[in-house]
């Protein structure tokens, strides 16, 4: 774990956007770390491919430069690949390598030591493409069930370890050369000096890509950095988000609560809950109001909702097999708002604006172009 502050920075940068297809909320928090090194992107409609959405989380290390550069430019590298029109999977893979090459050979970067994970979800014509390099992660909720969209790249994974060793490196204490805790990343050019293809370097930017067909029973997608996944399992994050959607909370509020839930009470927990945190929650509307998704999650998850609204206590298991006890009563921030399905479309000026945007996706998309990088 990196250096920590004496008190966490809990101020959050949160935002939302919506059209007829998506209601997206995001939030990021510095937490216990000395610097904020994450970046994230949500674009409802790509300028060069209208109607195609692009969401991403970048978890930087050794500085924020690579994460910030990727947040501003990775989607552009993907879009300009000649394969994009016929083979988006290949365009994503080559786009990751292209932006990495651009940074490596740009003299203005000097001896850049920073790196970044990248987990990307691109949605085009009801087909989802998830590209991942590193240990940020994406999951989806399909009819209340977990759909895993990416796998973490860790040095101790058999395939990753084989590539590291063949590239001239080694794995020590589950780290690349005893240093880096992930085995694929943008940047980290000190590990990319072998006389090999980019995808065969000790640390490679080459992503795995998963594809899915989005159907009517797809409810939401979560992209987050390991500051979340080190503390909560995939299933726990899914239940956390789905229960709160059923309670009528907006996606950006759920992101804020999720980070609060993961934040360590002190910096003595072995790194768990002490990292920067970034979450993007993409709710799938299917050309219906957000209130329909609220009702769906509420009605099909009544048991979980009733437990969340009460004071029951349950024991959950973290990714690192550490048991923890949590109270199931809702913990809502002062700025959070609980809404019923009927209130969701009738009771606020903000919601009226959202409804207007839902009727005019281009309006929402054009407004988002002003501030889609965080």
Task: Provide a role label for each language-model segment.
Residues 1-374:
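PP2C/PPM-type serine/threonine phosphatase catalytic domain
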